[in-house]
Amino acid sequence: MNISAKDLTVIPECLIVLIDKPNRGKTASMRNFACKLLARRGVSFVHPRSYPANLKKTGKDFTLVVEISGVRVGIVSAGDGDDCILHAVKVFAKYECRIGVMVVSEPARSGGSKLALDAYLKMKNGCKARVIEISKASIKKDTHEESNAEVTSILLNTLDFELKHTK
């Protein structure tokens, strides 16, 4: 899988990236974030097939594109595979997202994709976007649910800050 210079020409102004090892609840956290975001006033769908069908199913990857105060926000959880980064980049380009929120899996001995992480690092170094990385592993809570709630809160606060500065 290669991310070309052409793919990087339409990268959002800001990328918010949730990083952790495979099977650690990144998609569940992203799903919670998306559901909380959709519950807000002033959020309209750009990519309508994403919800509610995909968000109701747990453990499933999804793509969601919304518009908030005139700013398009793409949210992509495309798994741990080699093509997950390219899929996110293409979604952000297709829907002209100014802010992109995505999941990146760190490689692990038991799985994960070094190719995907390498592609992400290449994309990060090759684009002019602000890249905000949130490490799910650094959030220590007693339960999985508490950890997901904390990640959701961080994602929402980060997005709110970026929306104020992306016009």
Model-derived segments and spans:
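Glycine-rich phosphate-binding P-loop
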Residues: C14-R41
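Pre-Walker A adenine-sensing motif
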Residues: M1-P12
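Conserved nucleotide-sensing/catalytic segment adjacent to the nucleotide-binding pocket
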Residues: G42-P107
